[in-house]
Design a protein with these regions (language model features):
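Short acidic loop-to-helix transition motifs that present clustered carboxylates
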Residues: 24-25, 76-80, 99-107, 248
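Conserved NAD(P)+-binding/catalytic subdomain of aldehyde/semialdehyde dehydrogenases
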Residues: 92-179
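Single conserved hydrophobic/aromatic residue that forms the stacking wall/gate
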Residues: 336-345
Length: 345
């Protein structure tokens, strides 16, 4: 799993280029990509030890070149979970603490006698962790405001109800308030999926959680056309979107609001969440309208710089600056830019 996450993050990192360009003779503008200097990675382990979350946060920060990676996780059944701690260490964490909940993220953000504060917090958590990150945002950066996990299945008659039901319940079992939505243009498939959900719930070990979530937050939406399915999917902007149709690539081309797409019946959300290599820290509550999920670029800051190489360029830029300062009414800036230009004449 870590090999897959690392390989994809390394490929993504290669798409982030630094830049230097001469926009006018003697005027050089550029930007540098600098890793965040200290990151705190929170890995949940209260109800279930979320080993995959260590892969997604620690490994990705390591690929980005973060010099100091701090990882915390709550005790699992009274002890540090060995699988989680091992994943943190293998992923590249420099410091590991058994400290859970809002105490964990608070300690990383504010610091303690033994933990130096970090610059950024990443990783999922329960409602208390999410609220702690919200209140700490500003003092530190965060990856995103994550709510309960969400899933959407977009399907047509090319698949059966069993696979749709399995995908829906696979996320519904994560929590009592995890939305699971299906969009289809096949009434037959919709009815078949309802029946399969009832059947699977009877044998599912996590029946209590999954059935409550499906009862309160589950729905199947019947549409007339693929265009209507697309419109509804973009409106809902779900975290996980499983597309199983004869037009998968069309949805890939036209979907604009989502956390991550899982294309085709072979590409199930569970594997995508855990081992396939893309990051599972994704936007929820329609945040996919304006942001993507955690990726190597989240750990990279792009800083601009500028330099003027000739007196002629400095004079020209100074004249432009004087005019704009006068227009805006900033007299101090006007005097500064005017004097700078005059000194070079």
């Amino acid at each position: 799993a870590q090999k897959q996450v690392r390989s994809f993050a390394e490929a993504q990192l290669k798409t982030l280029s630094e830049l230097e360009v001469e926009t006018h003779p003697g005027v050089i503008l550029g930007h540098k990509n600098i890793p965040v200097q200290a990151v705190g990675c929170y890995v949940p382990a209260g109800k279930f030890p979320m080993v995959a979350s260590a892969h997604m946060s620690v490994v990705t920060a390591s690929v980005a070149g973060v010099p100091r990676i701090v990882a915390t996780t709550p005790p699992f059944k009274g002890k540090p979970n060995p699988a989680v701690v091992t994943a943190m260490k293998m992923g590249g964490a420099h410091e590991i603490y058994v400290l859970g909940g809002m105490q964990g993220v608070g300690a990383m953000a504010i610091g303690t006698e033994t933990i130096k504060p970090v610059d950024m917090l990443v990783g999922p958590g329960n409602a208390f962790v999410a609220e702690a990150k919200r209140q700490l945002y500003g003092k530190v950066g965060i990856d995103l405001f994550a709510g309960p996990t969400e899933t959407m299945v977009i399907a047509d008659e090319t698949v059966d109800g069993e696979i749709c039901a399995t995908d829906l319940l696979g996320q519904a079992e994560h929590g009592y308030n995890s939305p699971a939505v299906m969009i289809t243009n096949s009434r037959k498939l919709a009815e078949e999926t309802f029946k399969e959900i009832d059947r699977i719930l009877e044998i599912l070990p996590t029946k209590e959680t999954a059935s409550t979530s499906w009862r309160d937050y589950g729905e199947i939406i019947l549409c007339d056309t693929y265009e209507e399915m697309l419109s509804k999917a973009n409106e809902i902007a779900s975290e996980h979107v499983q597309v199983m149709t004869k037009k998968d690539d069309w949805f890939l081309e036209n979907m604009t609001s989502y956390g991550a797409l899982f294309l085709g019946a072979r590409t199930n959300v569970a594997n995508g969440d855990k081992v396939i290599g893309t990051n599972h820290t994704l936007p929820t509550k329609k945040a996919g309208r304006y942001t993507g999920g955690l990726w190597v670029g989240k750990f990279i800051k792009t800083h601009t710089y500028q330099k003027i190489m000739t007196d002629e360029a400095a004079t020209l830029i100074g004249e432009y600056g004087s005019r704009l300062s006068h227009l805006e009414g900033f007299i101090g800036c006007l005097l500064y830019t005017s004097d700078a230009a005059d000194d070079l004449r």
